[in-house]
Regions:
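Helix-turn-helix repeat elements of alpha-solenoid scaffolds
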Residues: 16-22, 56-57
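Short helix-capping/linker turns of helical repeat alpha-solenoids
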Residues: 7-8, 29, 33-36, 49-51, ...
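Terminal, low-structured helical/coil segments at or just beyond the last alpha-helical repeat
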Residues: 111-145
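Alpha-helical tetratricopeptide repeat
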Residues: 8, 22-29, 37, 41, ...
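Hydrophobic face of amphipathic alpha-helices that form TPR/SEL1-like repeat modules
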Residues: 42-49, 53, 78-85, 103, ...
Length: 145
């Protein structure tokens, strides 16, 4: 089977919703490039899941980082999970813990409990010194805001 060019009529025939997904992806990319934090987080999710764009964990991490560094809690969580798994970034439990800690600190209710449990699960893979380092990085991140 030969692949169809994304904008071709054959692509639309193979997947009728493609033009809609492509248009949504293009609009999200434009917003993300303009600095829209929600668009950056959404684009990270799109690259992470392969929805509307080819799956690419490196690109997901790049866009999640941009949103996370602006304080977007869900992007912080997603970036932390990428560091935990080593997807698109080198596996780094210190940075995983830091981003999950930042995300958990702004969540509420059950969402906060879930994020704190995920952070604490990562802590079981770390030394006491690494946890202290991650907490210090999170504090430094807050202090720089």
């Amino acid at each position: 089977m030969v692949a169809a060019h994304p904008g071709s009529s054959r692509a639309r025939e193979l997947h009728p919703s493609y033009p809609v997904a492509y248009a949504h992806a293009a609009a999200t990319i434009r917003g993300a490039e303009r600095g829209d934090v929600a668009a950056q987080a959404r684009l990270g999710w799109m690259y992470s899941t392969g929805r509307g764009v080819p799956q690419d964990y490196y690109e997901a991490a790049k866009w999640y980082y941009r949103a996370a560094n602006q304080g977007h809690g869900e992007a912080q969580f997603a970036l932390g999970m990428l560091y935990n798994k080593g997807e698109g970034v080198p596996r780094d439990f210190v940075l995983a813990y830091m981003w999950l800690n930042l995300s958990a600190s702004q969540a509420v209710g059950e969402n906060q409990d879930f994020k704190a449990r995920m952070r604490d699960a990562i802590a079981t893979k770390m030394t006491v010194r690494q946890v202290q380092m991650a907490q210090g990085l999170a504090l430094a991140w807050y202090s720089s805001r």
